[in-house]
């Protein structure tokens, strides 16, 4: 165990206050919260990645000074008007390209360095809006895309998983602007493939580079290893490392990436083997490697090994830095060992190692998880007094803790405190507060916050739309919920992952006997071409209609579905046949049966087996529903 000091006068006021109040160390099991989800990262939550830079190109993160774009960026006022003007035009006309281009041509927007990136960023998750603007800008006289614009577009298309379009874009660059192609462009692509868990495609980038005039070098290969390790594909990275040792001479960076990858997934034996390989290759571990090992031990619950390693570092001449202590504090906070986390914080100050934003954020998260929000504010005030600007994640921990306690006014007060130190709430903060407002029935406040968010130049993403739609629907504001859903579709944000929201909205609207409104929502999806409709989407729509008593409409849409070459799921067919039998509607039943029989024959399926499977599925679902209702009644007694 570390030799923790008892002398309190040497430490910060926050340490003195917290450690002098023994009553704050309550039994950890009394408190459960969602913050376990936030601590999955070894060094910091992914929510902080945008605010940190990579050290030596590996997985460890280091804090950069925070600068609020609106107050520190001298170009903000210069760009703001044109960015908003372009964004509003894109929202209004993006599905009608001729009108869109005409509106942009007549907008008076002057293309200049930096503006395109700002507009692309303003489009947020609506990548198709950004792509429309990118295409229009390329057609303008006396303008040529810069490498930064191309890189931004590659990131946007990759985030949408439009990798074919990405390669097409790079091919276009090769033909029209070959001088702009640089290795960093392929690094961006490698990172996106890795984040999408497309390991083979990420590796294939190395083979594609020569076609564009570049041979992969040690830097690009190192970025590939780093990306694979960062996103959990460390086994593939280790195999690739062995396969490529003759092609790319080993260096410390490669070993550090592998070490981070194994520690990240808790494979400490493999991590130790990397140390052996490192030593055999003539490299000594540095402070970053030691920090990765500390993180691995701590997150595996092996705190004794972590403390031993900390002492060993000092013996070897490596004085632990803020990152070293922070990974220990994060791991302790994660398992509710807050008293021990505070002792590590004390030890940190005893060795005159200054805590950074990540350290303070770890303490904030722990106290929030522990249910002591008042202590979070003490930590927050202390870090601000020391000149440290809290990060988005720092505020997010406190905001979510308030949400859990349904303290809406406290959320608004915290947002105001953020503004007072010139720190404007981001999308994540707005998501939490809007969700709580809807939950508490404060619909007007939710709408006000939404409008405020857009006025501040923030683009609602998929999560924000889903929160708003679900919240409005739960409060009976069905027209507003439907309007927001259609707006989400219009902005190109609707995809298969939002089918749950579609199902909830359709069922809620139909339950309220608003058939035309439900049809309008469905029509919006089909007419806008927002998402390639599949069997699941049709099933959601048909089941919603049928379950709410609209049998005729359900059958009509089923026939339309079949005509689009989608075969109904067996239980859908069985449900329709059962309903039509009760209604004595033999005409509809015969038409649907004949069409499905033909589809089964085309697919070389047994129609009898198909029918039997449908009846079985329907029976099992009915039984499952009865069991749930029975258990619910028992609990209510």
Swiss-Prot record:
Compositional bias ranges of the Basic and acidic residues kind: 616-630
Keyword field: Repeat
Pfam family, one: PPR_2
Superkingdom of origin organism: Eukaryota
Repeat keyword on record: yes
Cross-referenced SUPFAM superfamilies: TPR-like (SSF48452)
UniProt xrefs under InterPro entries: Pentatricopeptide_rpt, TPR-like_helical_dom_sf
Start-end of each PPR repeat: 146-180, 182-216, 217-247, 251-285, 286-320, 321-355, 356-390, 391-425, 426-460, 461-495, 498-532, 534-568
Positions of the UniProt region annotated as Disordered: 616-637
Family: Belongs to the PPR family. P subfamily.
UniProt protein name: Putative pentatricopeptide repeat-containing protein At5g65820
Organism: Arabidopsis thaliana
Lineage: Eukaryota, Viridiplantae, Streptophyta, Embryophyta, Tracheophyta
